[in-house]
Amino acid sequence: IIASSIERFATEIRHLQRTEVLEVEEFFGKKQKGSSAMPHKKNPILSENLTGLARLIRSSVIPALENVALWHERDISHSAVERNIGPDTTTALDFALVRLSEVIKNLNIYPNRMVKNLKLTNGLFFSQRVLLELTTVGFTREQSYSLVQKHAMNSWNTGSSFYENIVKDPVIIKKLPVNKLKKLFDFSYHTKKINIIFKRNLKK
């Protein structure tokens, strides 16, 4: 389970380092090579390594389960297995934890790229707030979902502003005035508890 949790972090970092995303990036030394064949690449090699280690560690689960059934509650058929997977697995896990810690400590973060990627959605990440607000002004959830989805799909397909699509809908504006609707597109709403979250989860 710990190894799989490590892999979750590693997989997320690998995705976020892709050229078209590039919101975070592993530290890259001056003399480091990202690819032996392509000099321009900066592959997340440490996170890739952690993914492989997680697979290796999980491979110990099957022999561990095979050790459950012993003759008359006790024989030594399990001994060779435990002598192998015990030290190998714990050593690999310790190494993976230390490596993940170093990756996170030295991770390059690109907030401006995060903002740029959010803007590419044309405001679609506000759709849930609009949906929930509509259910408080007289629409059923089904009606709210249908209204929001229609404008969200239009934004996806045409690249138009989700807010502009919503604000032009007379059915929505009749019950949700523009001044209230505009507040639903305030990005700070999603980050207002960020300090509390960090303090709660990063206690020493």
Question: Which residues are covered by each model-predicted region?
Answer:
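Acidic, glycine-rich loop-and-beta core segments that form the ion-binding/anion-interacting portion
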Residues: I1-V61
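Glycine-rich cofactor/substrate-binding loops
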Residues: M38-K204
